[in-house]
From Swiss-Prot:
N-terminal signal peptide: 1-24
Keywords: Signal
Organism: Bacillus subtilis (strain 168)
Protein name: Prophage-derived-like uncharacterized protein YozM
The keyword Signal is annotated on this UniProt entry: yes
Amino acid sequence: MKKRLIGFLVLVPALIMWGITLIESNKKTPVEVLESAWDEFGLFSFEIGITDPAITIGMDQTKSEAKLREYLKDNLSREAKEKYKIYIFKDDTDKLEKEHQEYLKENNLNK
C-alpha cells in the first residue's frame, strides 16, 4: 500500500511537469505567429518594439481586423499578450505597391 502511494506521489508530479514542459515548448514566438498570419490576413508589415513594448501591424484594408485580433488572441502566448500593446493600421496594398515602384524608379534601384 505504501509503495503504491509513494509511486503515485512521484508519478503525478512528474506527469504534470512533463505536460507543462510540452505546452511551453509548443508556444510560438510573436514573430512566428505574425509570419503564419501573413497571407491569410493580408499583412504587409509588422514591427515588434524592443524598448517600446508594442507590436505594430500593417494589413490590407480589405481584410478583417477583428479576425486578425481574434487570431492573435488565440495564438500569442499569455506573456506576449501582457507585454505588448498591439496597433493595427490598414492601407491599400495596390497603392503601396505603386508607391514602392515609384520609389525604386526615382532612385534607380529597379535595374
